[in-house]
Amino acid sequence: MKHITNKAELDQLLSTNKKVVVDFYANWCGPCKILGPIFEEVAQDKKDWTFVKVDVDQANEISSEYEIRSIPTVIFFQDGKMADKRIGFIPKNELKELLK
């Protein structure tokens, strides 16, 4: 699982991958700790998507650009543009459904 730390890195990823899902999290966040393993498990099943994580405490510039106010927040990008944004914990079956 790739961890993105700066805007240039995320921009590059979005320009070279058609489908990207980004998990914005923090190490101290309880719901983030529950979502983390689910996110990684679903990433193993959904090979047509690129899964990455952004630690909001390490990547303020990215968090500000995408207006991350609560965590976890998961953003789905298609063709370099935001297609969906979910705030809060996402159950595994719902996350899989969002990636269809």
UniProtKB/Swiss-Prot annotation:
Q: Which UniProt keywords apply?
A: Disulfide bond, Electron transport, Redox-active center, Transport
Instruction: Quote the CDD domains the UniProt record gives.
Output: TRX_family
> What family does the database annotate?
Belongs to the thioredoxin family.
Which InterPro entries is this protein grouped with? Answer: Thioredoxin, Thioredoxin-like_sf, Thioredoxin_CS, Thioredoxin_domain
Enumerate the spans annotated as Thioredoxin domain: 1-100
Q: What is this protein called?
A: Thioredoxin
Tell me where on the tree of life, at the top rank, the source sits: Bacteria
The record ties this protein, via Pfam families, to: Thioredoxin
Asked whether the keyword Transport is assigned, the reply is: yes
**Could you tell me one molecular function GO term of this UniProt entry?**
protein-disulfide reductase activity
* PROSITE patterns recorded: THIOREDOXIN_1, THIOREDOXIN_2
SUPFAM superfamilies in alphabetical order: Thioredoxin-like (SSF52833)
Please list the disulfide bridges. C29-C32
Q: Specify whether Transport is a keyword of the entry.
A: yes
Q: What does this protein do?
A: Participates in various redox reactions through the reversible oxidation of its active center dithiol to a disulfide and catalyzes dithiol-disulfide exchange reactions.
Q: Which PANTHER family match?
A: THIOREDOXIN-LIKE PROTEIN 1
